[in-house]
């Protein structure tokens, strides 16, 4: 196959209401949440950031300009995670595109637990869908 570019986000699902921005393991939960929200009439754009270094700011900003809402989803702790960097990007360069506050769905501010407890630590598709629904209340 072809090597993946290191500076490109991938739009896995096009949408018009909410941008779900994520990477790694949380992509699957974002896609599940997008399916559930579609049944409620909410159209989610799912963006796979893919590489955190050489961040594709253009794709993220264009998506949020289109949807006006962003949920950043990561499995890392909420504070000092890379999601905060994306939130800062939206505050600095995409503020006037936002119709609602940026929401971050992340792990707890603690160390990653043992595997048997991981499901209690990691955000879920339900958490992602809940955050997106809350953003839809802004208009």
Model region roles, listed by residue range:
Residues 1-139:
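Thiamine diphosphate
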């Amino acid at each position: 196959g072809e090597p993946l570019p290191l500076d490109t986000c991938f739009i896995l699902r096009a949408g018009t209401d909410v941008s779900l921005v994520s990477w790694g393991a949380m992509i699957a939960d974002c896609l599940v949440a997008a399916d559930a929200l579609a049944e409620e009439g909410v159209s989610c754009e799912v963006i796979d950031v893919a590489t955190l270094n050489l961040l594709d700011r253009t794709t993220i900003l264009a998506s949020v300009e289109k949807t006006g809402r962003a949920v950043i989803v990561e499995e890392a702790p909420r504070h000092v995670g890379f999601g905060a960097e994306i939130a800062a990007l939206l505050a600095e360069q995409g503020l006037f595109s936002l119709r609602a506050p940026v929401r971050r769905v992340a792990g707890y501010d603690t160390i990653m637990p043992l595997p048997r407890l991981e499901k209690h630590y990691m955000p879920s598709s339900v958490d992602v869908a809940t955050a997106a629904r809350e953003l839809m209340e802004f208009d």
